[in-house]
């Protein structure tokens, strides 16, 4: 279970902090970052709280690439997706935390890739742990995020993950710019 939340945090950290890391730094982060379920959920909560505040800024100072969105999507059962979107450079990753009243519903993992190599399925809790322990999704993420020289050919490998957890999340729909997300999701 811990590896699922580690993966969730890795995507958020890579997305929020990418301009601060070179390829070696990102590779080290993906291989070595370790975080608890509690901490991963707190990062989501921080993002939600910031979106709901009235102090959001709209300026975008992107020293690398622009016009590509990173989507932080929190899903609730029987409702529309809750999205936190940031306009930042390079790839698009989607992080989904799915809310259910009953946490006994099997964990759901969906890997989504552009145009080809589509793979999705419903897994039990243990099957999902096994999947992530096998590093399949992490390898896809690393290939996409780190291979900047051959980025055009790697855009078909963009994973997304649904994590089912009995957590309460408010409805929200807001756009965040790169610097805002970077600040909001900064790990202390």
Residue spans of the language-model regions?
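Sec-dependent N-terminal signal peptides
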Residues: 4-13
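Amphipathic alpha-helical interaction segments
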Residues: 13-15, 186
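Bacterial signal peptide processing site
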Residues: 17-21
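Extended, compositionally biased repeat/scaffold regions that form elongated interaction surfaces
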Residues: 23-188
């Amino acid at each position: 279970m811990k590896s699922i939340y580690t993966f969730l945090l890795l995507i958020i950290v890579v997305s929020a902090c990418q301009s601060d890391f070179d390829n070696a730094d990102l590779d080290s982060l993906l291989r070595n970052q370790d975080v608890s379920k509690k901490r991963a959920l707190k990062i989501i909560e921080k993002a939600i709280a910031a979106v709901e505040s009235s102090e959001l800024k709209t300026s975008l100072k992107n020293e690398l690439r622009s016009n590509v969105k990173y989507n932080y999507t929190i899903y609730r059962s029987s409702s529309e997706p809750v999205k936190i979107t940031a306009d930042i450079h390079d790839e698009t990753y989607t992080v989904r935390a799915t809310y259910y009243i009953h946490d006994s519903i099997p964990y759901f993992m969906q890997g989504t890739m552009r145009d080809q190599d589509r793979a999705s399925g419903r897994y039990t809790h243990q099957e999902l742990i096994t999947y992530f322990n096998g590093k399949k999704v992490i390898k896809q993420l690393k290939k996409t995020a780190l291979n900047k020289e051959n980025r055009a050919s790697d855009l078909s490998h963009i994973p997304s993950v649904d994590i089912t957890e009995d957590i309460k999340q408010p409805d929200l729909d807001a756009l965040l710019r790169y610097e805002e997300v970077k600040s909001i999701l900064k790990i202390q």
